[in-house]
Amino acid sequence: MNRTLQPDRGASQTAPAAHQARAFAPASVANVAVGFDLLGYPMDQVGDTVTVRRIDTPQVRIAAIRGIAQPLPLQTERNTAGAALLSMHRDLALPFGFELEIDKGIPLSSGMGGSAASCVAALLAANALLEEPLRREHLYRYALDGEAVASGSRHGDNLGPLFLGGLVLCTLERLVPVTVPAAWHSLLVHPDTLLETRRAREVLKDPYLLPDIVTQSANLALVLAGCYHGDAELVRAGLRDVLIEPRRAPLIAGFTAAQQAALQADAMGASISGAGPSVFAWFQTRSAAEAAAPAVRAAFTAAGFDSQAWVTPLISPGARLL
């Protein structure tokens, strides 16, 4: 499966096909235990949809935000989708503007990449309205500016998977697709509670010990090697977080029990999705992931939270025009 960055359809057009476009971007799992701010993949069963209209006034404005994540700022500079389009608009010095409407399907502060989804969907839709649409790696730079509004830092682990699909290694300069066996699936469980990204980052400020950093680096190497070779035992040996999870786990009621439930169901590994509170786990088959879901959800029920669960292949599609 070729997941290298490609120009969008219509990139050679000399005039926009329409004055309105819509795009969908799915939820995503970021960090993946061993790749803090570096590694992520999409979960395409839930996501955000953004409609962008081309307007004569050279400005970016948000007309409406609807859906399950409320309230979110309508001020362009304070909204990830708006900030990303502002970055594009200023960089290209466009003589026209954009008006956008955001339909949120991803819960707020869920660790499911909601800010990234709105951001990428907005960029894809706006890009379709340009006389000469840009390649997706160019859009990635604008998306990084948008994501910084939500978390206070530029990081691409939620963004890259939405541009490429599948498991992606994301630096600030490039996106690298990671080969994964088609049979491997991810379980994602979201408890009905909030954990703000900025708060989750605050607990990471204290220094880390060098031996822990070395261990985490080795774990990342094991996971990447296991993915490329299709070796579940390598992944099982490496898919554990010794840096971020120990500091964030106390912020998530029920996390430890949920993680143990997944591991007892033969998960290759389980940890916090993004900043949390959602939890992900990797399995070698869809049936194993589906069988584990009730026990993981039960752990959050015992902690006092309702929850939702989704199962998707690790090789899932990213954002797309509608």
Curated annotation (Swiss-Prot):
GO molecular function: ATP binding; homoserine kinase activity
Enzyme Commission number(s) from the entry: 2.7.1.39
Reactions catalysed: L-homoserine + ATP = O-phospho-L-homoserine + ADP + H(+)
Annotated metabolic or biological route of this protein: Amino-acid biosynthesis; L-threonine biosynthesis; L-threonine from L-aspartate: step 4/5
Amino acids binding ATP: P107, L108, S109, S110, G111, M112, G113, G114, S115, A116, A117
SUPFAM superfamilies: GHMP Kinase, C-terminal domain, Ribosomal protein S5 domain 2-like
Single biological process term from Gene Ontology: threonine biosynthetic process
GO annotations of cellular component type: cytoplasm
General function of this protein: Catalyzes the ATP-dependent phosphorylation of L-homoserine to L-homoserine phosphate.
HAMAP family: Homoser_kinase
Protein name: Homoserine kinase
Gene that produces this protein: thrB
